[in-house]
């Protein structure tokens, strides 16, 4: 009965996810798969009690199911522990990771990120914003749409760098770092001072390490930070935007699969 109830709940939640997150995303149907799994597990017990299948087969299936649940729980805890208590002030650069720019949609991940960026810049006006994101499935360049939103909200366009080539979290961070390095090199060249020979000995001071913030939704912080560290980011801090309450469980599940994929590929 318990497994049957879990199956019903997964089916109901899956329907909510599809209506809120969209019909076209295949991953939004994952909760129907879980509903089927719970129903199947319940049937498995009945088959065993009726002596139609051996005990080892039931134990094997339930062990795999338990392992899956444990992976999800451990990943969710890691995500929760990665969230910052406060935003690091005075960052040199703030990378806003791109996502689908569905700004008119209620509970938009993108809007949450951009509104958080505006809040941060209001408190730290000298920070340079780096918007990262290439062409999405809808044909729109994520970073361009996101930058336009910030400009409409009063952010100085000269305070925004736009990266348009990336298509995933890892590429976001690779191309954003390259853009930051190029921007910093251009600034350094434009401010170099010619030293007159008779001014005496000059000591060259090393450049101050750049402090970089990575802004994304709360469920995405853990993976983004792990990727950044793998790529060699040093002075890096998380800046967390909120996410929708109703879809949060779905986002955690989706992120669990993404973390496992990135771990398998060696990205984290």
Where is each model-derived feature located?
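Structural motif marking the loop-to-transmembrane transition
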Residues: 1-2, 29, 53, 57, ...
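A transmembrane-helix-recognition feature enriched in membrane-embedded lipid enzymes
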Residues: 252-268
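Membrane-embedded alpha-helical segments of integral membrane proteins
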Residues: 1-47
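Transmembrane alpha-helices and immediately adjacent membrane-cytoplasm interface residues
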Residues: 41-85
